């Protein structure tokens, strides 16, 4: 259930143990009348992972075998691969650090603090348990993830109190500063390929065709529309005594044709990375018809999309690899931007952090629902009977009454009917059959038979909810709860006709200054009466 974060923050600050221990009150209890089965329905793939999976399939279609390359690379490997370029490469890598294990001393004063937190005295056995477990932690025999649990089990005390003890009694833990190691996060997929090929060269025959699609990390000064600190590289290698740059061209064309690219240009890369053989480092440009005339910087249809080259013997020999190796790589996010015509990589990869967020009409429509639903079969039957009666007789002249349903619900025998007593009107108002649509960000209740709203009906996103649907279900639920009259007159907002707008959709619509318009004469009265 929904809770107030500010109130919980205050409670947590005052007494973490109590706030945490009682946080279960915010979790709804299972309702035996509800069906919690998760049914198959269309989901939505992220552009990056959609592209990533298609790249995996594309490589497999070309006969490549998928591998997982090491993601943690020793600094020494960078020097082996890049030689005197290594320092420039290392300037852009992330070194891995960790917190040292503190040498914790425990005085009588600290034991007194612990007793105050635990609310009980510590036995000699308890004190020895604390000393022993902290000593094992220092020696690395207990992992940080297990420290609280082991202390909790050893002392027979709630783990939340142990967490408070560590925070309050042992400031050494909070004063720790990370110590850097000589291990790095992979900045080039190439770093992993040398290690992988070095391990496989004596076990596999050539030609050996491998690929990997995975994360790489660069210590960029800042992220921008074209560059992120963490991104996915789709990389492949062919190890073969007779491999040439023509293999690189063939792989590039075979791979990218599967994504709609139809023409290719190959240009020497000015970077001349030292892990490639001189004059083999090639940039790949592809022409994609969908980009021609697009509102992007690729409007001429051409885009730089990949790079390939032949690994140098100077680098390969460091791993005892005696064969030339062609390597091709491309950025998954870059390809995803092209295929989805995105203008900013940050917004495409992390849409949840966009200052200017966007919802499609269909996404908003999925956030519109009926406010109430009957919980019994009889209630459901009542709702369906109300809807059927209005569909048949909604325009009947008044005064009029139409019996809808008769039966027993919750042990009471009742009769349900629709009624309009006033003369010169109809059983229901003209807006009773209006349906909720989302069009260009507006949420509208429209009559589908009115030509004025033909464009909305044709191009908008339907919610599938008519006024009568929501009202009938609400009336049925009211009857289940013993409320025997549901009357709606003029509608001005969704809530007037028991239509619910998710708070996210409401914030979006209001924030974008779109409108919600459910105005219309509904004028319907649904009643129930007890019968003998």
From Swiss-Prot:
Gene3D superfamilies: Bira Bifunctional Protein, Domain 2. It is an enzyme of class 6 (ligase). It holds the Pfam family tRNA-synt_2d. It catalyses: tRNA(Cys) + O-phospho-L-serine + ATP = O-phospho-L-seryl-tRNA(Cys) + AMP + diphosphate. Substrate binds at residues 188-190, 233-235, 275-276, 327. PROSITE patterns: AA_TRNA_LIGASE_II. SUPFAM superfamilies: Class II aaRS and biotin synthetases. Keywords: Aminoacyl-tRNA synthetase, ATP-binding, Ligase, Nucleotide-binding, Protein biosynthesis. One of its GO terms (biological process) is translation. One of its GO terms (molecular function) is phosphoserine-tRNA(Cys) ligase activity. InterPro entries: aa-tRNA-synth_II, aa-tRNA-synth_II/BPL/LPL, O-Pseryl-tRNA(Cys)_ligase, Phenylalanyl-tRNA_Synthase, SepRS_C. Its EC number is 6.1.1.27. Coiled coil: none annotated. Homotetramer. Interacts with SepCysS. Belongs to the class-II aminoacyl-tRNA synthetase family. O-phosphoseryl-tRNA(Cys) synthetase subfamily. Catalyzes the attachment of O-phosphoserine (Sep) to tRNA(Cys). This is O-phosphoserine--tRNA(Cys) ligase. It comes from Methanocella arvoryzae (strain DSM 22066 / NBRC 105507 / MRE50). The lineage of its organism: Archaea, Methanobacteriati, Methanobacteriota, Stenosarchaea group, Methanomicrobia. The gene is sepS.
């Amino acid at each position: 259930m929904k809770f107030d974060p500010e109130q919980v923050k205050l409670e947590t600050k005052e007494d973490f143990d109590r706030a945490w221990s009682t946080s279960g009150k915010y979790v709804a209890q299972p309702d035996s009348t509800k069906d919690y089965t998760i049914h198959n329905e269309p989901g939505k793939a992220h552009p990056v992972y959609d592209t990533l999976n298609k790249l995996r399939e594309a490589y497999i279609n070309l006969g490549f075998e998928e591998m997982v390359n090491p993601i943690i690379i020793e600094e020494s490997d960078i020097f082996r691969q890049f030689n005197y370029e290594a320092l420039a490469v290392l300037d852009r890598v992330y070194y891995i650090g960790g917190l040292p294990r503190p040498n914790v001393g425990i005085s009588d004063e600290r034991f007194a603090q612990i007793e105050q937190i635990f609310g009980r005295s510590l036995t000699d056995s308890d004190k020895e348990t604390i000393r022993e477990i902290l000593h094992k932690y220092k020696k690395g025999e207990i992992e940080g993830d297990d420290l609280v649990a082991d202390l909790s089990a050893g002392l027979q005390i709630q783990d939340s109190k142990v967490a408070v003890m560590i925070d309050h009694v042992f400031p050494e833990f909070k004063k720790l500063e990370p110590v850097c190691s000589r291990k790095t996060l992979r900045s080039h997929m190439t770093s992993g390929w040398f290690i992988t090929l070095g391990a496989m060269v004596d076990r596999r025959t050539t030609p050996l065709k491998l690929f990997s699609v995975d994360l790489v990390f660069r210590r960029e000064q800042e992220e921008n529309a074209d560059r992120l600190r963490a991104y996915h590289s789709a990389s492949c290698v062919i190890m073969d005594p007779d491999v040439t740059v023509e293999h690189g061209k063939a792989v590039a064309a075979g791979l990218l044709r599967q994504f709609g690219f139809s023409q290719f240009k190959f240009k020497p890369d000015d970077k001349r990375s030292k892990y490639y053989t001189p004059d083999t480092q090639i940039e790949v440009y592809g022409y994609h018809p969908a980009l021609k005339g697009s509102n992007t910087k690729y409007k001429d249809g051409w885009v730089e999309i990949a790079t390939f080259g032949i690994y140098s013997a100077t680098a390969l020999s460091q791993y005892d690899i005696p064969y030339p190796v062609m390597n091709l790589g491309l950025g998954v996010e870059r390809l995803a931007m092209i295929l989805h015509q995105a203008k900013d990589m940050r917004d495409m990869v992390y849409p949840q952090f966009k200052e200017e967020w966007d919802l499609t009409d269909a996404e908003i429509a999925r956030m519109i629902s009926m406010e109430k639903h009957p919980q019994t079969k009889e209630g459901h039957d009542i709702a369906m009977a109300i809807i059927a009666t209005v569909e048949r007789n909604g325009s009947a002249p008044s005064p009029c009454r139409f019996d809808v349903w008769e039966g027993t619900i919750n042990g009471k025998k009742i009769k349900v009917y629709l009624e309009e007593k006033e003369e010169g009107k109809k059983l229901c108002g003209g807006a009773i059959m209006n349906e909720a649509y989302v069009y260009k960000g507006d949420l509208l209740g429209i009559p589908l038979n009115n030509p004025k709203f033909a464009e909305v009906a044709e191009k908008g996103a339907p919610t599938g909810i008519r006024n009568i649907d929501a009202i009938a279900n609400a009336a049925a639920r009211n009857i289940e709860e013993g409320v025997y009259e549901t009357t709606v007159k003029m509608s001005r907002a969704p809530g007037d006709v028991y239509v619910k707008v998710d708070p996210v959709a409401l914030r979006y619509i209001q924030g974008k200054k779109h409108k919600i318009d459910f105005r219309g004469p509904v004028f319907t009265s649904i009643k129930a009466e007890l019968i003998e």
